[in-house]
Amino acid sequence: MEVKLLNDNLWYPTNKIFINGQWKDCNSKKRLTIENPSNGEVIAEISDSCEIDIDEAVNSASKALGNSWGDLTASERGRLLMKLSELVRNRVDNLAIIESIDVGKPLKQAKNDALALARYFEFYGGASDKIMGETIPYLKDYTVYTLREPHGVTGHIIPWNYPMQIIGRTLGASLAMGNACVLKPSEEACLTALAIGQLANEAGFPEGSINIVPGLGEKAGSCLIKHPDINHISFTGSVEIGKKVQTEAAKNLIPVTLELGGKSPQIIFEDANLEKALPFLINAGIQNAGQTCSASSRILVSKKIYAELIDKMSKLYRKLTVAQAIDDKDLGPVISSRQREIITNYLKLSKDLECIAEGKYEKNLPEKGYYVLPKLFGDVKYSHRLAQEEIFGPVQVIIPFEDEEDAIKIANSTKYGLVASIWTLDGARQMRVAKAIKSGQVFINNYGAGGGVELPFGGKGYSGHGREKGFEALYGFSTLKTVAALHE
């Protein structure tokens, strides 16, 4: 049923690559299969791009910079992005169904991602002609000013968990600054990424401004990173691969934006509004089956309200339902058998812990689907591996703390620094703790701020470096030139 539903919503080829505004067969003539994680069935084939394909894509982008794409004004680029946003919005329902089946994400979450994609292109379309340089007071007879210019050709390596969201925030910002892009989506889930090629043509983007080359990371991704004509790399994925990306990029001395892992805490003080906090505490941990870099996998709670919190969270946890993605329940499957195995192996480390609550499976789930029950563990020591390492699954641990100082110490005890949340009504405490937390984002009495296309996003430590989203991302996708004119 899902295969027919998928095909009914596809309006572009999935088994080709997109270079210079055209769909074509990859030079390797090889294909990779895409599975539906809800039932393990093969739902599509994609191209297995090789070095020749990557070279053609980069050359196409380079040529576009020298003619049709590079000749556009900032406002003209902005109008193209606005048109792309409109086309995405017109296809929200199609894209949501495709993403839900491809990634295994509940339909309502996939629809939110499609709407976010449209908003990213809208935001960066509006920002395209708002980038300004500065004039700098200097010596007599000098006029000094700065210019913001594109890097040139940017490479974008996109993960499987949020293809649309991450395309929106990296491709959108890069195009707004005038870069030409080569996109290498994940081989595990890339069907909505391929839609961007078709939509770009419909919007009127010049040939070569956007190129899409799916394939294996160790082959297509590696070739893209090593290509001598790539001027900037944006990578979202694991810490392990992020280190390799940065190492290879360093050989060509090109800048890299890394958005990697997380072990993000929510800190619940004794004066917190628990009724308001509860949906955030749970949803931030189980959204997309916990396969989110900014997932809140650690819940730090004051010992004064520990018993009350676990009672309330446990009751809600037991109501969570795992089902096929298209059935639109609380959780769908994880992406693959490999990811399920990783999560299962971590759960084997929990034998010394108390599982205080878990969700339930929907009846008659397909046997070949990659399903994992959400689990909540109580009274966990902050040094435990389940409290230190990124699991990338629906597993949350509750860690009690003594006081504010103890909470800060525990929150900062991992290698990561992506997101944190503070729940307290004490304004002075809000400011103190927000300043003390080692994290790229801190939310106060909320978590995620509703997605926040406008809000800069990025990490510290093992969570990576550089910033995506918001106006700040435009600076990362540009270089600064200083011009000093002497008037004699």
Show which residues each predicted segment covers.
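A short acidic/small-residue loop/turn micro-motif
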Residues: 25-27, 31-32, 47-52, 272
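Residue-level signal for inorganic ion chemistry
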Residues: 40, 77, 99, 121, ...
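Conserved C-terminal structural/oligomerization subdomain of aldehyde/semialdehyde dehydrogenase
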Residues: 41-44, 230, 267, 371-488
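Glycine-rich loop-to-alpha-helix module at the N-terminal edge of alpha/beta enzyme cores
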Residues: 41-131
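Short, well-ordered beta-strand elements within core beta-sheets of diverse protein domains
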Residues: 43-49, 66-70, 156, 266-269, ...
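Rossmann-like NAD(P) dinucleotide-binding subdomain of oxidoreductase/dehydrogenase enzymes
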Residues: 133-276, 328, 401
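ALDH superfamily catalytic-core signature
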Residues: 240-381, 444
